[in-house]
């Protein structure tokens, strides 16, 4: 079973892009109740003290306007993730800063 995931690079509005991937499962305990039709928005926000805040916008049902915000700041704060160059030519740029992200999204198998 797969879910739709959209990774959005908003660090620089000029090169703002979207990367959609399908995943088979999500291993983070706070996300284990995702359904097959779920959509996740992983959004990077520039922090005043040069760190990065990562949040996941979890939409349980597309037909409803109900959004549950799952904040992963505590999970990521020791990594200080930065997503300034994680998209290159429609491929995920696999650098060491993305290791924690790949633990949450371990089975990225399709990029389109």
UniProtKB/Swiss-Prot annotation:
It comes from the Bacteria. To Buchnera BU585. This is Uncharacterized protein BUsg_564.
């Amino acid at each position: 079973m797969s879910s739709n995931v959209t990774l959005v690079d908003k660090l620089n509005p000029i090169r703002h892009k979207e990367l959609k991937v399908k995943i088979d499962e999500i291993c983070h305990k706070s996300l284990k109740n995702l359904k097959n039709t779920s959509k996740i928005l992983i959004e990077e926000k520039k922090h005043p003290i040069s760190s990065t805040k990562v949040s996941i916008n979890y939409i349980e049902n597309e037909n409803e306007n109900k959004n549950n915000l799952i904040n992963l700041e505590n999970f990521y704060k020791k990594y200080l993730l930065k997503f300034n160059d994680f998209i290159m030519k429609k491929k995920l740029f696999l650098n060491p800063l993305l290791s924690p992200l790949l633990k949450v999204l371990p089975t990225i198998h399709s990029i389109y």
